[in-house]
Amino acid sequence: MNRIVRRTLQTAVRTASPWSLGALNHVAIAVPDLDEATSFYRDVLKGDVTGKEDLPEHGVTTVFVNLPNTKIELLYPYGEKSPIAGFLAKNKKGGIHHICIEVDNIKAAMADCEAKGIRLLNKGNLISLIDK
C-alpha cells in the first residue's frame, strides 16, 4: 500500500502544472488579399468585422472577425520584413498561421514550454495584440 501511495504522489508531482489552458481566443489566417478576405467575412458570411489595424512593430495589418465564442484574425503583410510575407510566399493562397489559446499564467506557461524544449517565437508580452 505504501508503495502505491508513494508512486501516486510522485506521478502527481511530476504532472502538476503551474498553468492551465483556457478558452480559444482566436484563429489567425494569413491572407493574400486583405480587402477580399474582409469582404468575404463581412458581406458573404455576415460577420462582425473590425477595421484594419496596422501593427508595424509586428509586420502585420490585422482585421478581426468577431464570432459569438471566439475571433478570426485576418493577417496581411505590413512592410518588407513581415513574417506574414514569408508565410504567404510558401502558401500562395494563405492559410492558418496560428491559434491563440488563453492560459491562466502566461509567464509560467512560457517557462514550462521552454523547459520542455518547445521553441518560443516571442518571449515578450503578447497581450497588446489581442487584449482590445
What are the roles of these predicted feature ranges?
Residues 9-36, 94-103:
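N-terminal beta-strand motif that seeds the catalytic metal site of vicinal oxygen chelate
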Residues 16-18, 40-41, 87-90:
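A short alpha-helix capping/helix-coil boundary motif
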Residues 19-22, 29-72, 109-111, 115-123, ...:
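Core segments of cupin and vicinal oxygen chelate
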Residues 88-118:
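Short, solvent-exposed interaction modules
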